[in-house]
C-alpha cells in the first residue's frame, strides 16, 4: 500500500507525566492520499494532527501524546492500547472536500489500514531492542480482512486535556484513563445549583393589588338644567274641586281689595306679595305652614293678568 509507518510506538518512563512520541507517516505512491488516526483508548491519547493529506512521495510527522497515568506500571506490564491508521487515494472528485468528509464518499475496498502497537519501555536495553523493531514495517491489512473482535478503534482527539497542561514538566498528575466517567466535583455541583438559588433570591415579589377605592366624583355638565321635581298625581273628589274653586275666588277678591286700598304695595316692597303666602323650597316642595294655591282655570288666569296690567298702568300714572 501507499502508506508506510512503524509497527510500534515506545513510550519512555516515567509514565506518570505527559509523554510525547513522534510517528512518521510516509506516502510512497505517485498520488496524494488522505489519512486519519484511530485508537482503542481515545481518552488516554492525543494525536496531532489526527488526520490530513500527504502529498505524493512525501512524509508527515504525527505527534502522539500519552496522558499521565495515575500510577507507574510495573516492569513487564504489557500495554493493550493500539492505533489504527487509515488511508485512501484522493481522487480528483475528492480534491476540494474536507478530509473529515471524504470517508463517507469512499468505499471500504479503497481504504487501507495499518495497525500500530503501544509499548512501555523498561530500561535502556529494552528501549534499544524496541528501537530496532521500531523501524520494521508494520503489518498491512485492508478493510476486507476483518480485524480482531476485541479491538474497537475510535478517532483520536486532536487536543490535549486541559487538566494535564502542566504535566510536561514531569509533575505527576491524575489520569482519567482508569475511571473515564468521573463523578462531578462538589464545585461543579454547587456551580450548577447556583443559578437556581440566585434566580429565587433575585426574583421580585409579586406586588399586592391596590385596595384603594377612589371616591366617586359628580360631574355636572355646563348649561345643564337642574332636574325638575316630579309631580305626584292626586285624585280629587268633586267636593274638593268645589272647595278649590271657592278658595280661588276668595283669593282673587282679596287681591282686588288689597290692590284698591293700598296701591303702593308694588313699589319695591318685596315683603308684601299679592296676598299670597310665601312658598320656599329647595326642590319645589312647600315649607311647613305655607298655603298651597291650587291651579286656576285658564280664563281666571287671563282675567287676573289683565287686572294686574291695568293696576300697573294706574300706578304708572300716579308716579
Curated annotation (Swiss-Prot):
Task: Using the UniProt annotation, give all residue ranges assigned to the region (Disordered).
Answer: 127-244
Which phenotype arises from disrupting this gene?
Leads to the dissociation of the cortical endoplasmic reticulum (ER) from the cell periphery and its accumulation in the cytoplasm, in particular in the vicinity of cell tips; when scs2 is also deleted. Affects contractile ring assembly, contractile ring anchoring and displays severe cytokinetic defects; when scs2 is also deleted.
Cell compartment(s), UniProt: Endoplasmic reticulum membrane
Which loops or segments lie on the Cytoplasmic side of the membrane, by the record? 1-298
Alphabetical UniProt keywords: Endoplasmic reticulum, Membrane, Phosphoprotein, Transmembrane, Transmembrane helix
In which residue ranges is the amino acid composition biased (Low complexity)?
A: 127-150
* Cross-referenced Pfam families: Motile_Sperm
According to its record, how does it sit in the membrane? Single-pass type IV membrane protein
BP-aspect Gene Ontology terms: endoplasmic reticulum membrane organization; endoplasmic reticulum-plasma membrane tethering; maintenance of ER location; negative regulation of 1-phosphatidyl-1D-myo-inositol 4,5-bisphosphate biosynthetic process; plasma membrane organization; reticulophagy
The region annotated as signal peptide is none
From the Swiss-Prot or TrEMBL record, what is one GO molecular function term?
A: phosphatidylinositol binding
Q: Which residues carry this modification: Phosphoserine?
A: 237, 281
Polar residues composition-biased segments? 151-165, 185-201, 231-244
Tell me the ranges covered by the MSP domain, including all copies. 1-121
Q: Does the keyword Phosphoprotein apply?
A: yes
Question: What residues form the membrane-spanning segments?
Answer: 299-319
Sites bearing Phosphothreonine, chain numbering: 236
Major subcellular location class: endoplasmic reticulum
Q: What cellular component GO annotations does this protein have? A: cortical endoplasmic reticulum; cortical endoplasmic reticulum membrane; cytosol; endoplasmic reticulum membrane; lateral plasma membrane; nuclear envelope; plasma membrane
How is the quaternary structure described? Interacts with epr1.
Role: Vesicle-associated membrane protein-associated protein (VAP) implicated in maintaining the cortical endoplasmic reticulum (ER)-plasma membrane (PM) attachment. ER-PM contacts function to modulate the distribution of contractile ring components to ensure robust ring assembly. ER-PM contacts function also in controlling exocytosis and maintenance of cell polarity regulating cell shape. VAPs play an important role in regulating eisosome assembly. VAPs also contribute to ER-phagy by tethering atg8 to the ER membrane, but also by maintaining the ER-plasma membrane contact.
Q: What is this protein called?
A: Vesicle-associated membrane protein-associated protein scs22
Q: What is the originating organism of this protein?
A: Schizosaccharomyces pombe (strain 972 / ATCC 24843) (Fission yeast)
Provide the gene name from the record.
Answer: scs22
Amino acid at each position: 500500500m501507499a502508506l508506510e509507518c512503524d509497527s510500534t510506538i515506545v513510550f519512555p518512563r516515567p509514565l506518570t507525566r505527559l509523554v510525547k512520541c513522534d510517528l512518521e507517516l510516509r506516502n510512497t505512491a505517485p498520488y496524494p492520499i488522505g489519512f486519519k488516526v484511530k485508537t482503542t483508548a481515545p481518552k488516554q491519547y492525543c494525536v496531532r494532527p489526527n488526520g490530513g493529506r500527504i502529498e505524493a512521495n512525501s512524509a508527515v510527522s504525527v505527534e502522539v501524546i500519552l496522558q499521565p497515568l495515575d500510577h507507574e506500571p510495573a516492569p513487564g506490564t504489557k500495554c493493550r492500547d493500539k492505533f489504527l491508521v487509515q488511508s485512501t487515494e484522493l481522487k480528483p472528485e475528492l480534491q476540494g472536500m474536507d478530509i473529515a468528509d471524504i470517508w463517507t464518499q469512499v468505499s471500504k475496498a479503497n481504504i487501507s489500514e495499518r495497525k500500530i502497537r503501544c509499548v512501555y519501555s523498561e530500561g535502556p536495553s529494552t528501549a534499544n531492542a524496541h528501537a530496532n523493531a521500531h523501524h520494521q514495517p508494520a503489518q498491512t491489512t485492508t478493510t476486507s480482512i476483518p480485524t480482531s473482535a476485541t479491538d474497537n478503534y475510535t478517532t483520536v482527539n486532536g487536543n490535549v486535556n486541559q487538566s494535564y497542561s502542566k504535566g510536561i514538566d514531569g509533575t505527576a498528575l491524575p489520569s482519567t484513563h482508569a475511571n473515564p466517567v468521573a463523578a462531578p466535583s462538589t464545585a461543579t455541583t454547587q456551580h450548577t445549583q447556583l443559578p437556581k438559588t440566585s434566580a429565587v433570591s433575585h426574583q421580585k415579589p409579586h406586588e399586592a393589588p391596590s385596595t384603594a377605592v377612589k371616591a366617586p366624583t359628580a360631574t355636572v355638565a355646563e348649561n345643564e338644567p337642574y332636574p325638575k321635581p316630579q309631580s305626584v298625581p292626586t285624585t280629587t273628589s268633586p267636593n274638593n274641586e268645589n272647595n278649590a274653586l271657592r278658595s280661588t275666588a276668595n283669593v282673587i277678591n282679596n287681591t282686588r281689595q288689597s290692590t284698591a286700598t293700598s296701591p303702593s304695595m308694588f313699589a319695591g316692597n318685596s315683603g308684601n306679595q299679592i296676598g299670597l303666602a310665601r312658598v320656599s323650597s329647595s326642590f319645589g316642595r312647600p315649607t311647613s305652614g305655607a298655603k298651597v294655591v291650587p291651579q286656576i282655570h285658564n280664563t281666571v288666569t287671563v282675567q287676573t293678568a289683565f287686572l294686574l296690567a291695568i293696576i300697573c298702568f294706574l300706578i304708572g300714572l300716579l308716579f
